[in-house]
Amino acid sequence: MESHTMLSAQSRWRNAMADTFAMVVYCTVVNMLIEIFLSGMSFEQSLSSRLVAIPVNILIACPYGIYRDFFMRQARKMNNKGWTKTIADILAYVTFQSPVYAAILWVIGADWHQIVAAVSSNMVISMMMGAVYGYFLDYCRRLFKVTSYQQLKA
């Protein structure tokens, strides 16, 4: 029984590390590109945003992973087709990340128009790339040898 508890704790630790790594890397790269090229923010504003976002991403990575896994379990209950997973990934990403992203931009001093432009752009791009993050997260979980959400019991 004790080894099961240790394995479970180790699995949770690996899951947390994988989720954190994926969140920090993905959000830094994608959001910096959005902020500079689509939202008209300066490099310095975007860099400030990303520096504020890293500790935030570290804090929200595990809750997001749990939130996303919930969406995945619900999608699996509906059916086990690939498009259902894609939609669940998109919905989880957009509904969780958009309010967090808006708050980060507000904290670094972006004006209302920049916030709306960045969050709106991020939402549109997330509809195309939200599933990409899901696949990236799954990849990171495999790298960290985490039991994938498909293998977990609901």
UniProtKB/Swiss-Prot annotation:
Exports L-alanine. One of its GO terms (biological process) is amino acid export across plasma membrane. The keyword Acetylation does not apply. The chain crosses the membrane at residues 21-41, 51-71, 90-110, 115-135. It comes from Escherichia fergusonii (strain ATCC 35469 / DSM 13698 / CCUG 18766 / IAM 14443 / JCM 21226 / LMG 7866 / NBRC 102419 / NCTC 12128 / CDC 0568-73). One of its GO terms (molecular function) is L-amino acid efflux transmembrane transporter activity. Disulfide bonds: none annotated. It comes from the Bacteria. It holds the Pfam family AlaE. The keyword DNA damage does not apply. It is found in: Cell inner membrane. Keywords: Amino-acid transport, Cell inner membrane, Cell membrane, Membrane, Transmembrane, Transmembrane helix, Transport. It is a multi-pass membrane protein. Belongs to the AlaE exporter family. InterPro entries: Ala_export_AlaE. One of its GO terms (cellular component) is plasma membrane. The gene is alaE. This is L-alanine exporter AlaE.
